[in-house]
Amino acid sequence: MLFVHEVHKVDGRKEDEFEAAYRDGWMPLLAKGDDARLLWYANHAHGSGVSYQVVTITGVRDGAAWERLARRMQQGDLHDWACETDTYRHEVTARIMLPVYWSRIQDVDFDTVPTDGSEHELSLFMEDTGWPYVPIDDYIKMWDELYSQPITRHAEGTGTVSIDIQACFQNAFGTGLRREAMLWQRIPNPETVLHLLTHDLDPEMRKPGTYMYDSLEYRDQWESKLLRTSKWSPLY
């Protein structure tokens, strides 16, 4: 399965129209077939970064389905929708991503993805994108061994989940930077993020043998986005 990750710079005066285009247009239009589904629609929380930025992730069954979807956007039944949606945003950048070998999400059963716009509580995600100076495979392995596995063991030992790592993706060939990968993490308790924002990192957490120290052998540059799902986002 392919995952199309898009970052939309929305016209602030037309944010409602843009959201409606995805809720009332893109989502139900994809639901008419079996090639793709809108999975997540999330707003970059105001006060935490760039204004009026929306992140969407669309699941696409395979490469052939992606080509059919691209042709529909270029000259088929989705062309008018795409042209109208462009009037609600300044710019959109996209990359096709693949789940890494240890990602919990490898594919999605489209039959389980809601497409009716039903509303639910909001949820908070932290999207971490990193750019290693080592081979991308080494970086992905490090994320598993030094980050994901310890978090899982901590959750199993305490019975609490502070960070729910739902997926890890890397860019597919020809669609973005070679050495780039992304963590898609749900934050069950926003207090987790609040603590990060309001406290210095404990020196004990920066010593050799800790994730924050040892991971510097792989990269020292990454970007974190705090994203809040819409009340109708299919997954949340």
Residue ranges and their predicted role:
Residues L2-K14, Y101-P190, T229-Y236:
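Surface-exposed interaction/gating patches
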Residues D16-W40, H46-S51, G59-M97, E145, ...:
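An amphipathic, aromatic/His-enriched active-site/gating alpha helix that lines ligand/cofactor pockets
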